[in-house]
Amino acid sequence: MFKVYMLMSLDIHKHSYVGYTDNLKKRLMLHNNNKGAKYTRGRQWRVIYYKNYNSKSVAMKEEFKLKKTTS
């Protein structure tokens, strides 16, 4: 099962980030320990949205759509 997720930073500027993963708990830990995507480094994050998908390809397409609407 794959998840498309949106994160919100805990800092005053409220940055957002969209991604996909098969392990959301582990991925959030990586983002919060400066091991995630380059954009997320140096900030603390919380999950504000996620949705499950049965296939990686569908999750990737949905991630792309969500990134386009939030940028």
Q: What is the predicted role of each segment?
A:
Residues 1-53, 58-67, 71:
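GIY-YIG nuclease catalytic motif and its immediate N-terminal context
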